[in-house]
Design a protein with these regions (language model features):
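Short, small/polar-rich loop/turn modules that mediate ligand/substrate recognition or access, typified
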Residues: 39, 131, 136, 195-197
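Substrate-binding pocket helix/loop in short-chain dehydrogenase/reductase
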Residues: 54-56, 60-65, 161, 165
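The beta1-alpha1 cofactor-binding region of Rossmann-like NAD(H)/NADP(H)-dependent oxidoreductases
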Residues: 17-29, 61, 178-179
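Active-site helix of classical SDR
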Residues: 79, 115, 123
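Short C-terminal tail/terminal secondary-structure segment
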Residues: 50-53, 104, 168, 184-185, ...
Length: 209
């Protein structure tokens, strides 16, 4: 576990299990973080799930609620409670994870793409509200990244679809999680102090074609 690894290196850590689609759990997560560290300087809202592949007419309400509950409402809920703390401090930085699915369409992935489009709208609106209060909010849009979600797509029989998408990536490879982490750290740092409401696409050139 990452928290255990960091603790072993001498860092103070706190691991909290949280279902981001549950507002009460999200509030408790933020409260526990503030109790442990005294404040909340930065947050990365990264939880996400894929929808079951289906045409729009065949997508189920259950799957829609599951995906939007995590990918859209989850981001909204996390921001809500993070901002309540940052507002008290008068400072902070939030990065929300959208996806290239947030700037493109995707057949049979309407719920996922719709939720990720929504994340960008949430981010821009909140960024306008809080920029003058010392709080910056931005979005990252990762492309094809070697993550557990990609592994699940392969295991679920979508390897051919993933390979076809990868052939369209000009850089010719999957992204690495640490490449996204570096971008998030930059957006949260003082080096990005003028960056507000921005949508940073990190996809190896996939979306510029």
């Amino acid at each position: 576990m990452a928290a255990d690894q960091l603790a072993g290196e001498g860092y103070k850590t706190l691991a909290v299990v949280c279902d981001v689609s549950d507002d009460q759990q999200v509030e408790e997560m933020v409260n526990k973080t503030v109790a442990a560290f005294g404040r909340l300087d930065a947050a990365y809202n990264n939880a996400g799930v894929q929808n079951e592949l289906a045409d729009a007419a065949d997508q189920t309400r259950q799957d829609f609620d599951r995906v939007t509950g995590v990918n859209f409402r989850g981001v909204w809920s996390c921001m809500k409670y993070e901002l309540q703390q940052m507002r008290k401090q008068g400072s902070g930085a939030i990065v929300n994870c959208s996806s290239i699915g947030g700037i493109l369409g995707g057949a049979q992935r309407g719920t996922y793409h719709g939720a990720k489009h929504g994340v960008i709208g949430l981010t821009k609106s909140a960024a306008l509200e809080y920029a003058s209060r010392g709080i910056r909010i931005n979005t990252v849009c990762p492309g094809l990244i070697h993550t557990a979600m990609a592994e699940k797509m392969i295991a679920g029989g979508q390897k051919e679809a993933l390979d076809a998408m990868l052939q369209q990536v000009p850089i010719g490879r999957l992204g690495r999680p640490e490449e996204i982490a570096s971008a998030v750290l930059w957006l949260c740092s003082d080096a990005a102090s003028l960056v507000v409401g921005h949508t940073l696409v990190i996809d190896g050139g996939y979306s510029i074609q």
